[in-house]
């Protein structure tokens, strides 16, 4: 695995957050762009094993590109993604291969295994492989399959949806997973030398005050290497859209969200890479929150809150 450079990404008074962009530049000398790959799979809370319809905030494309539903082969998906990545890095290493949509280790491993066999030839250009899945869909065989990919890629990440540390909220949002399965999956991935990234959502229906802090606590206890922060968003073609239209969902404003994330960061270990500070969706899909600033502006708001109080990622862990 590629050694991680600490110096130029280390959080402190001048650099308040260890962002992925900073970490990639420290490690690879450049930023790498994700190339989204879609295998056209599903999730247990869509297929009937744990429910139907999926999580209330998830679109019919599984929060991905929907390319597989359009019958686009992986080669075509790669070519489109690489073209975009080459705008940033015209030569050499340029990309992160990211299996994003749905749960990529469910219902069985054969589609993922076939996909991995296809994409290995791109490892010289895309040194990092990232695979998203639910914690309750991550088995020892899945861990072994991904661990074998370290022969081809410099880094292999597995991205687990945590979303909330409250099992009751898991039920409210139709996810039907548990905090314990998150910890079990993270432990299993660690045993196989895989880097763990967790997704956290702020503002879910039923979430109690301090919910984002509890998610960071869970991430810290699981010793994850990376984390993504998302504000709750209402997208078209989701169950959440119906609830929002009926006035049954409260949305966070950008200032409240920036307050929540900046506070949570102070309790996040400084070595954890922050892969995302704020989410963004295509304008044609986005319904709410309304009047939300551009992603870069919210990013700046979060870091500014930290610098204004002379703080940074992980500063309060020692107090």
Locate each region found by the language model.
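Structural recognition of alpha->loop->beta junctions
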Residues: 55, 119-125, 214-228, 298-313, ...
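N-terminal [4Fe-4S]-dependent radical SAM core
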Residues: 1-93
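Core AdoMet radical
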Residues: 61-81, 85-109, 124-138, 155-181, ...
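Alpha-helix N-cap and loop-to-helix initiation/capping positions
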Residues: 73, 111, 173-181, 207-214, ...
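Hydrophobic faces of well-ordered beta-strands that scaffold small-molecule active sites
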Residues: 33-37, 95-98, 129-131, 156-160, ...
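Conserved C-terminal portion of the radical SAM core fold
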Residues: 180-239, 255-278
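Distinct, well-ordered alpha-helical segments
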Residues: 109-117, 139-150, 212
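Auxiliary Fe-S-binding modules of radical SAM enzymes
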Residues: 1-22, 26-33, 226, 233-319
């Amino acid at each position: 695995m590629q050694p991680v450079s600490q110096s130029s990404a280390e959080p402190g008074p001048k650099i308040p957050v260890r962002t992925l962009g900073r970490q990639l530049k420290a490690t690879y000398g450049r930023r790498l762009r994700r190339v989204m790959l879609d295998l056209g799979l599903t999730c247990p809370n869509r297929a009937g094993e744990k429910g139907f319809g999926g999580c209330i905030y998830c679109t019919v494309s599984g929060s991905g590109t929907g390319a597989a539903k359009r019958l686009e082969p992986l080669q075509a998906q790669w070519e489109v993604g690489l073209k975009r990545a080459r705008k940033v890095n015209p030569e050499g290493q340029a990309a992160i291969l990211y299996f994003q949509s749905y749960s990529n280790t469910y219902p069985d491993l054969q589609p993922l295994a076939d996909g991995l066999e296809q994409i290995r030839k791109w490892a010289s250009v895309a040194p990092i492989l990232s695979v998203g899945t639910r914690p309750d869909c991550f088995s020892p065989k899945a861990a072994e399959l991904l661990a074998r990919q370290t022969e081809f890629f410099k880094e292999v990440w597995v991205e687990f949806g945590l979303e909330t540390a409250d099992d009751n909220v898991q039920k409210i949002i139709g996810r039907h997973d548990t905090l314990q399965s998150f910890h079990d999956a993270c432990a299993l991935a660690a045993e196989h030398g895989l880097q763990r990234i967790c997704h956290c959502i702020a503002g879910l229906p039923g979430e109690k005050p301090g919910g984002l802090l509890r998610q960071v606590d869970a991430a810290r206890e699981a010793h994850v290497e990376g984390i993504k922060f998302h504000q709750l968003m209402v997208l078209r073609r989701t169950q959440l859209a119906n609830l929002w239209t009926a006035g049954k969902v409260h949305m966070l404003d950008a200032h409240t969200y920036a307050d929540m994330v900046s506070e949570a960061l102070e309790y996040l270990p400084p070595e954890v890479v922050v892969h995302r500070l704020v989410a963004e969706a295509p304008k044609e899909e986005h319904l709410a929150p309304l009047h939300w600033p551009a992603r870069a502006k919210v990013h700046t708001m979060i870091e500014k809150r930290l610098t204004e109080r002379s703080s940074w990622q992980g500063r309060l862990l020692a107090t």
